[in-house]
Design a protein with these regions (language model features):
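Residue-level detector of functional hotspots within protein domains
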Residues: 6, 39, 64, 71, ...
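Bacterial N-terminal signal peptides
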Residues: 7-16
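Bacterial N-terminal signal peptides that target proteins for export
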Residues: 1-7
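Extracellular, repeat-based ectodomains that mediate carbohydrate processing or recognition
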Residues: 218-661
Length: 661
């Protein structure tokens, strides 16, 4: 070892022992655009390379990438995932290995480094070796771009800061990693240095490496994910969840393009355009993937727009279905969900107000069961589920959907819960159940309600008592009705308001999760706040827990429900024949005033209510076979109960739907 090397080693060790000073400033990554070095410029050594960077994140639970080459799970990635920092290497074709370290604390600078030598992956935290994993092999030859702060141009964006980012075409020794952590530069640390990016590197739309590094990362347009093409017709996704060994085959299944009740809203009437815009989960003729589709009904002409294919979610899971919002300026927002944390979620905005021809990707991250609400003059109050030890109910707020407040947990009772929400006059309310500890998600019970009148800053019970959040115990002031001791499951369907702002909640209760008569009765039930107490009344019955339809509060005493309450061609599977029910005494008595479909080929499922629903486009749903894969068609109805089927083949910009006899 040379005297120079010994001096460097001594300096490294002394610096590491003393502790390094975190950077004063870094490069800000807000998810608004990706940065990448073109693949032709990268040329990583397939058996010897190293990464290092200071990291400061806003949230250490989100999946976020520091440096990446290749698609997810390929080539190499230095990233935060599932609460750990990973150094991943695809050391054999189609097979990857990783080493991982503890995550950074939100808002605090932490230094990470990773290396690979053809035999071992190492990851370092604050200058010290944190983990190593055997991974004999090498990277495949490639010309993939090196992304900084994201997986690619639309996924897993870093939300925070990076500083002193370095890339080498060799494997650094432990002592050299300690020196980098200590802020050392030059000498041996310049050997095979491909890139060093600091706050001084940013030059408009480029990150120019400090010498002797040569790589330049360029700002890319965000959004190659988006398709923005016209569909050839209206095709809904078919999906099933959990096979069951009986004649009903699945826990739930069918044409689920408008699934589920916890994805709200899926349609929105815009008065200035006199159009109801809607989204749904679409597919191709093979049901091979889930497309997010956007269309509208023109109330002036009675015609429907040829749907726009927004994006391919690369799954057939209907839990990834989209929802829609429209802001004060008429821009259409599509929130693309994910089932859990394994896939990314997206937010897109129309390029023009009241126009579906082109959308632009605005944000990528993760959320499930999306319930965003544009609150006039305030912005977006986004209720959603985040999978962390169950199904916690969370919220964000934002003015532009690019920058969000820190995710705030509202409730996580035992194993979590599901919710339904809707806007009232100057407020937003949510009704939810809970999953009892130790029993799993198939068990859900009890009914709760809370609301906010100040854009989510505080939340109150229905009688105005401010809640201490998050709600963590099943016995709490938000409780509407207790069902656990009665061994009744509670399935959330809808919430609406009367003229005084009093909420009315719609649920279905049952004896258990499995399809079939053993868990009868499935009872549609309303819970109305009278101003002094909850008035809970049973309405009528159907044959499946996942029979879903909305509650239309047309006056303080006249309410309407449109849903698949009548047995369909696949009885005891989700959905059935659509019927219209009416009460004129605030839920005391209900009458089925019209059976809207009959002798159907498939069950009809998940009727959805537009925001500001208009009489000529009052609800939208899909159909599909309840016990085997099938095609799925889309329908809408008017307030009178007439049903219209959207065409499976569309070639013109605007089309008429077929009215059913």
């Amino acid at each position: 070892m040379t005297i120079r090397s010994l001096s460097l080693l001594a300096c490294c060790l002394l610096s590491a022992l003393a502790g390094a000073e975190p950077p004063a400033t870094g490069l800000v990554f807000d998810g608004s655009h990706p940065w990448a070095v073109p693949g032709k410029d990268v040329a990583l050594n397939p058996t010897a390379f190293s990464f290092a960077t200071w990291v400061r994140v806003q949230d250490n639970k989100e999946s976020q990438v520091f440096l990446n080459q290749g698609k997810a799970g390929t080539l190499t990635s230095f990233y935060l995932y599932n609460g750990k920092v990973r150094m991943l290497v695809e050391n054999k074709p189609g097979s990857y290995t990783f080493a991982m370290a503890e995550p950074p604390q939100p808002g605090e600078w932490t230094h990470y480094a990773g290396s690979y030598d053809g035999q071992t992956i190492r990851v370092y935290r604050n200058g010290k070796l944190a983990a190593k994993t055997k991974a004999a092999g090498s990277l495949a030859k490639n010309k993939a771009s090196l992304f900084v702060g994201s997986l690619n141009d639309f996924e897993r964006f870093l939300k925070g800061d990076l500083a002193d980012i370095r890339v080498w075409n060799r494997t650094l020794a432990d002592s050299e990693i300690a020196a980098v952590y200590a802020g050392e530069t030059g000498g041996e640390l310049d050997n095979e240095l491909l890139a060093r990016w600091t706050a001084e590197s940013k030059q408009d739309t480029q990150l120019a490496s400090l010498p002797p590094g040569t790589l330049t990362a360029r700002q890319l347009k965000m959004g190659s994910l988006l398709i923005n093409e016209k569909a050839d017709g209206f095709h809904g996704i078919w999906y099933y969840n959990q096979k069951i060994p009986n004649e009903y085959v699945y826990k739930y299944s069918g044409g689920l393009g408008t699934y589920c009740a916890k994805h709200i809203p899926m349609a929105w009437y815009a008065p200035k355009a006199n159009k109801t815009f809607f989204c749904y989960g679409g597919t191709d003729e093979q049901n091979s993937t889930l497309y997010h589709m956007v269309s509208y009904y023109d109330h002036a002409t009675g015609m429907v727009a040829r749907p726009t294919v927004l994006l391919d979610k690369k799954t057939t899971d209907a839990h990834d279905n989209p929802v829609i919002n429209i802001d004060d300026d008429g821009y259409i927002w599509i929130f693309s969900s994910s089932h859990g944390t394994g896939r990314p979620s997206y937010i897109s905005r129309s390029a023009k107000p009241y126009d579906i021809d082109k959308f632009e990707l605005v944000w990528t991250g993760n959320f499930s069961y999306p319930q965003p609400w544009y609150m006039p003059g305030q912005g977006f109050l986004f209720l959603h589920t985040y999978y962390k030890g169950g199904r916690g109910l969370n919220m964000w707020t934002s003015q532009d959907c690019k920058t969000w407040t820190k995710r705030r947990l509202l409730s996580h009772i035992e194993m979590g819960q599901y919710q339904v929400s809707f806007r009232g006059d100057g407020k937003l309310g949510t009704a939810f159940n809970m999953h009892p500890a130790g029993k799993g998600l198939n068990w859900r019970t009890n009914l709760y309600y809370m609301e906010t009148k100040d854009f989510g800053k505080t939340w109150q019970t229905v009688d105005g008592k401010t809640l201490d959040l998050p709600i963590l115990k099943k016995d709490n002031p938000a409780l509407v009705a207790e069902y656990q001791s009665k061994a009744r499951n509670v399935y959330m369907k809808d919430v609406s308001y009367d003229s005084k702002g009093n909420p009315i909640i719609l649920v279905v209760t049952s004896g258990g999760y499995a399809s079939g008569p053993a868990n009868d009765p499935r009872t549609w039930t309303t819970a109305r706040w009278t101003g002094s107490e909850w008035d809970i009344r049973e309405a009528f019955k159907s044959d499946n827990n996942y029979d879903t339809g909305p509650l239309y509060v047309e006056s303080d005493t006249t309410w309407r429900i449109i849903g698949p309450t009548q047995p369909g061609p696949q009885p005891y599977n989700p959905g059935g024949e659509i019927a219209m029910w009416l009460t004129k005494d605030a839920g005391a008595h209900w009458e089925m005033v019209k059976q809207m479909t009959a002798n159907s080929e498939f069950n009809h499922t998940y009727v959805r209510r537009p925001v500001n629903a208009q009489p000529d486009f009052y609800g939208i749903w899909a159909d599909g076979h309840g016990r085997q894969p099938s095609k799925s068609r889309l329908y809408y109805c008017n307030q009178a109960g007439d049903v219209f089927r959207l065409p499976e083949v569309v070639t013109e910009p605007m089309v008429k739907a077929e009215k059913l006899d």
